[in-house]
C-alpha cells in the first residue's frame, strides 16, 4: 500500500511539473507563428464598419451613429483606401445638411471620422497588437478546446497595472485586462477577446473609470494575418461625463 501511495504521489508531482511546460509550449507556438506573418502579401478587401457613441453630461445626452462601407488594398505601392462615389456623395450631402441643421444625423461622416488610419490598421496588422499584448501579459492557464468544430487551444492571460509602460500607467490607480487567445494546432491565432477595466485620477482631484470588451476573429491571406470580424464596447466616466461606444467592423477579402 505504501508503494502504491508513493507511486501516486510521484505521478501527481510529475503531472504538476508538466503543466507549466505545456503552457509555455503553447505560448511559444503562438509567438513563433506570429513571426511567420511578414505582412507583405498583397490583398484587397471590403470593410463594413459601424459606430454608436452615447455621451451624457448632466441632463444633456448626445447620441451619434455612423456606418460606412469602403475598400482597402495593400501592395508594394502602399495602402490604398477607396471610397465609392455613393459614399462620397452621402458625406457631401451630410456636410451641407449640417450647415442648415446642426442636429442632423451624419452617419457616413461619423463613420469615416472614426475609422481613420489608426483604426483601420487594427484590422490590417493584428500581429503588432498581439505581440504588444504578449509582452505585457502573464500566462494564467491553457485549455484544449474546440473552435468551429476543430481542435484548438485557448490561452488565458492577464495584463496587470505594473506591466504597462510608464506612459500607459500615468494617472492610473487600478488596471487589469483579462485576455483570451484561441490558437490552432500550429499556433496561428483564430480569435481573441480582451476584457479590461481601470480607474485613476487626473490632477489628483478628478477621478475617472473605464472599461472595454473587444472581440476579434482572424483570417490569413498568404503570409498576412488580418482581422475578419471586430466587435468592441467601451465606456468611461469622470468629471460629470459618461461615454459609451460600440464599434463593429468586418473585413471581406476580394481576391
Mark where each language-model region is.
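Positively charged n-region of N-terminal signal peptides that target proteins for export
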Residues: 1-8
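Structured extracytoplasmic
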Residues: 25-176, 197-208, 238, 247-255
Amino acid at each position: 500500500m505504501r508503494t502504491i501511495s508513493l507511486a501516486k504521489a510521484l505521478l501527481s508531482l510529475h503531472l504538476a511539473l508538466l503543466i507549466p511546460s505545456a503552457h509555455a509550449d503553447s505560448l511559444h507556438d503562438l509567438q513563433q507563428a506570429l513571426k511567420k506573418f511578414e505582412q507583405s502579401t498583397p490583398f484587397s478587401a471590403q470593410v463594413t464598419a459601424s459606430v454608436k457613441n452615447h455621451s451624457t453630461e448632466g441632463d444633456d445626452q448626445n447620441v451619434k451613429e455612423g456606418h460606412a462601407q469602403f475598400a482597402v488594398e495593400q501592395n508594394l505601392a502602399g495602402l490604398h483606401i477607396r471610397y465609392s462615389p455613393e459614399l462620397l456623395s452621402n458625406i457631401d450631402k451630410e456636410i451641407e445638411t449640417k450647415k442648415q441643421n446642426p442636429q442632423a444625423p451624419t452617419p457616413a461622416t461619423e463613420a469615416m471620422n472614426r475609422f481613420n488610419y489608426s483604426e483601420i490598421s487594427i484590422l490590417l496588422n493584428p500581429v503588432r497588437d498581439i505581440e504588444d499584448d504578449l509582452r505585457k501579459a502573464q500566462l494564467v492557464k491553457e485549455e484544449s478546446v474546440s473552435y468551429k468544430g476543430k481542435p484548438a487551444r485557448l490561452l488565458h492571460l492577464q495584463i496587470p497595472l505594473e506591466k504597462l509602460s510608464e506612459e500607459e500607467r500615468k494617472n492610473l490607480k487600478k488596471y487589469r485586462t483579462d485576455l483570451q487567445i484561441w490558437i490552432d494546432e500550429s499556433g496561428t491565432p483564430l480569435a481573441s477577446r480582451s476584457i479590461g477595466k481601470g480607474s485613476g485620477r487626473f490632477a489628483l482631484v478628478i477621478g475617472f473609470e473605464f472599461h472595454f470588451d473587444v472581440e476579434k476573429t482572424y483570417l490569413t491571406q498568404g503570409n498576412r494575418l488580418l482581422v475578419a470580424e471586430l466587435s468592441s464596447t467601451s465606456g468611461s466616466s469622470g468629471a460629470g461625463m459618461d461615454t459609451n461606444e460600440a464599434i463593429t467592423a468586418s473585413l471581406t477579402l476580394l481576391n
